[in-house]
Amino acid sequence: MKEKSPQEKNAAERQVSLITEALSKAVDNKGVWLNEQGKQYPRFYPKGAAVSPFNALVMGLNSDKNGFSTNLYTLFSEAKKRDESVMAHERGVPFNWYAWNKYVNRHNPEDIISRKDYQELSATDQTQYKGIHNREIRVLFNIDQTMLPLKDKEKYEDVVKANVGANEDKALRSQVNDFIQKMKENLMAVRKDGSGVAHYDTEKDAVYIPKQENFEHYSDYVQEMLRQVVSATGHQQRLAREGMVMKNGIAPSEDAVKQEKLVVELASGIKMMEMGMPAKISKENMGLVDYWNRELKENPCLIDAIESDVNNALDAVSYTHLRAHETGR
């Protein structure tokens, strides 16, 4: 593995710190570890440019820890251009920025194309290529750390109002039902289960979820559904994550299984944040928090594996959801 730069090492330490602190807090917070205030998904201010799932996780955790009003962030230079400079002595949060200058064919390593050529491909053809990335660490600041709240209080309050608070119940349920329908049409079946136990059936390629009445809160039902969907992306026929795949008839190691459970909790939590809801650690996995925290702190490579697995899992889900909209389904 390529040696990390000092900036990458510092960023990784900060990312690990934010994740482990949040997981530890969940133990005494009824399992809630992310987006307790129901803020909307992290984005760049003011244009609203989207960010990767892992970056969104770090931005959301940083916002939670510091009590910021929104998950909206900006670069120091961009805030200065808007005459909304970052205030003195503020600490930013690391952002993993990838420069995708070249792309390689997933099935032919000798087929390498430029970014320009990649952008000219159809959405379907683009899926045949993956980026050859060069990672840079940028530093972002929440808009609460800028002069915006002081210089234009009314504008700031309007921005906060538009980016805080869970969706109205009817709209939220419609959003969740739409997501489930798109999963059924494009990724896997999502069915009701009478046994009372959520699970994924590999033979039927279907997720089974108990009725909503079996859960204390609607958000618990939604996140358990998301856990099962994320878990299903790791099976052999999809992303084949280490913790989900038999090799030569041998089951995954205990450590790999525990890491997979962390990926599922983080990825489903990020998706909950995208829907404007708080995320919880499941009761079944609460006992793994100390193990996860120890591994994240002691293994400097684990955070990179987590970033890759979380991004790939949610990209698989999001691409399927997006494709359904593009094809008019």
Model regions and ranges:
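A short, hydrophobic C-terminal helix/tail in secreted or cell-surface proteins
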Residues: A324-R329
